[in-house]
UniProtKB/Swiss-Prot annotation:
Belongs to the APS kinase family. This is Adenylyl-sulfate kinase. Pfam families: APS_kinase. NCBIfam families: apsK, PRK03846.1. It comes from Bacteroides fragilis (strain ATCC 25285 / DSM 2151 / CCUG 4856 / JCM 11019 / LMG 10263 / NCTC 9343 / Onslow / VPI 2553 / EN-2). The gene is cysC.
Length: 202
């Protein structure tokens, strides 16, 4: 009899991603929203989740509210911590995607290097980068939390768009300017590219 040298035999018995996607009747994918604070990332993410839910599709939103207060509550806002924040988000997202769950992330993620790292972790075939390209002037005008005003007064250091740069994605799957597009229009454009990616063709 051939000896089994696998010291972790449980992995031979674990269900595959395909098994889970067949159960859910959908494909896992990462929808990564990037853009300035106040650009509309979270608003669009929530509206998209609702539309996908109506179609019987299981989603999970990851954003600053549920990440910074949980798994990343020990991280600050230094450059090192910002990179680690995105790395952990990407690793957690990969677990969801491998379970067949449509994962929606809404983070400023201000430069191409940090977003490319996330794409490498998740896997480029599963990564849809969505640029919410609302101009700074419009984001600053909205300023619901008063963050831009504080940044202008120097009360917040390294604030993206004011005292820290934002690099626009070079080749996003889609760009959405919410100063021009309504929420409904933005979601409809998203559905056009998302639904074909998440649908299983038996």
């Amino acid at each position: 009899m051939e000896e089994n040298n696998n010291i972790y035999p449980i992995f031979d018995r674990m269900l595959t991603r395909q098994d889970k996607e067949e159960l859910l009747k959908q494909r896992g994918v990462m929808i990564w929203f990037t853009g300035l604070s106040g650009s509309g990332k979270s608003t669009i993410a929530i509206a998209l989740e609702r539309e996908l839910h109506k179609r019987g599709l299981l989603c999970r939103i990851l954003d600053g509210d549920n990440i910074r207060t949980g798994i990343n509550n020990n991280l600050g806002f230094s450059e090192t911590d910002r990179v680690e924040n995105i790395r952990r988000i990407a690793e957690v997202s990969k677990l969801f995607i491998d379970t067949g769950i449509i994962t929606i992330a809404a983070f400023i993620s201000p430069n191409n290097d940090i977003r490319e790292m996330a794409a490498r972790i998740v896997g480029p075939d599963d990564f849809l980068e969505i640029f919410v390209s609302t101009p700074l002037a419009e984001c600053e005008k909205r300023d619901v939390k008063g963050l831009y005003a504080k940044a202008r007064r120097g009360e917040i250091k390294n604030f993206t768009g004011i005292s820290a740069p934002f690099e626009a994605p070079e080749h996003p799957a889609l760009s959405l300017d919410t100063s021009v597009l309504s929420l409904e229009e933005s979601v409809n454009r998203l559905l056009e590219i998302v639904l074909p990616r998440v649908s299983r063709h038996e």
